Regions:
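Hydrophobic transmembrane architecture of multi-pass small-molecule transporters
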Residues: 154-160, 172-248
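Transmembrane core module of solute transporters
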Residues: 1-20, 27-154, 158, 162-164, ...
Length: 248
């Protein structure tokens, strides 16, 4: 964080972001038509999508390092072990879409974020030597919660704009969700790597951590739990935002 490049980038962002908003607001052919955010439902749904990105994407990185560092898996095995999260989304997304079309999307989207928050909180009980099935269950539950959120929330967003502006709406959604993902990875990795010796981090990140002792891994496990609590709290905020958005 003390690197001049990082500091310079943050300063540039603070200066350029308001300028970008001004240009987009008053330009003849804006890249992003900001007037779509005047609709309260769309604004709330995109805010929830941003929070979803903030609370989900870093989780994949955290667990890759957990499997490699704490459990001694090679990178390929660590990646395969993330499959329950994708399977959870695969099952819940279409069912959530059908439910939202019939019963509405607001409550279901909020419930999805709540389910994910519970699973993220449960992940803080994992130890370095926990059996795989425990983390697999919680990853699957996060995936189910994400699927319950994504389909209804996206449908609500797209339903607020006319057909000829849905491309703009989809672009805005992806921009904010990806922004949340980038910020999530930056902040969570800062938490996870805090106070962990560089040689230990190198072994964890490179997938050669099988020789690390429990004492060497303890700072990493502690930081991982802290990061998971942060992600769980962020998901609760997302659930509240989803629940408070207008019905129509």
């Amino acid at each position: 964080w003390n690197d001049p490049v990082v500091i310079g980038g943050l300063i540039a962002a603070v200066v350029l972001l308001p300028l970008w908003v001004l240009i987009e607001r008053h330009g003849r052919a804006p890249m992003l038509d900001l007037t779509i955010f005047e609709n309260r439902l769309f604004a709330a749904a995109t805010a929830a999508a941003f929070i979803n990105g903030l609370s989900r994407f870093a989780l994949l990185f955290v667990f890759v390092f957990y499997y490699q560092g704490a459990q001694g898996d090679d990178p390929i095995t660590a990646g395969i072990k993330l499959a329950p999260m994708a399977l959870g989304m695969l099952v819940s997304s279409p069912l959530a879409g059908i439910w939202a079309d019939r019963r509405g999307s607001r409550t279901l989207a909020a419930l999805g974020m709540l389910v994910s928050a519970i699973a993220l909180a449960a992940m803080t009980t994992l130890q370095a030597n926990s059996p795989y099935w425990q983390s697999a269950v919680w990853l699957g539950l996060v995936g189910i919660g994400s699927g319950m959120f994504n389909s209804p929330n996206t449908a609500a967003m797209m339903g607020t704009v006319p057909a000829n502006r849905r491309g703009i709406a989809a672009g805005a959604r992806m921009m904010l969700q990806n922004t949340g993902a980038v910020l999530s990875i930056a902040f969570v990795l800062a938490i996870v790597t805090s106070a962990v010796p560089k040689d230990v981090l190198f072994k964890i990140f490179s997938g050669v951590a099988s020789g690390l002792s429990d004492a060497q891994l303890e700072p990493f496990i502690h930081n991982m739990r802290t990061a998971l609590w942060v992600l769980a709290a962020t998901s609760l905020v997302g659930a509240a935002v989803s629940l408070m958005r207008p019905k129509s």
